[in-house]
Amino acid sequence: MVLAAAPAAAVVTATTVSVQGTAATTCQVTLNAKVTPTPVGGTVQFRDGTVAIGAAAAVKADGTASVNHTFSTTGAHVISAKFNGAAGFDASTSANLTVNVGMGLNLGSICLPIG
């Protein structure tokens, strides 16, 4: 009889989400996620409520993933980031982050909140 070692348990991960930039219509922001501990590979899907924001972003060597996004409507947007897991790493979802989006005026090199 040959005995094999039990497979190692997957590492539990935690994901956080943040927004960089002016949250205003027509103004591009960067949605950032951080997965800890840093997985080898995997993707993060950002969501606005239940709606996926673009394609899933690859997790970089430092455990971060990001996507650029322009909000098309004003009001409260509930943003989350889900790490989809990777070999040896469990999936995890961030806490919700409420982003209040106002009206914006995109002047190309600068974006101004208005109203």
Model-derived features: positions:
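Solvent-exposed beta-strand/loop surfaces, strongest in extracytoplasmic domains of secreted
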Residues: 1-115
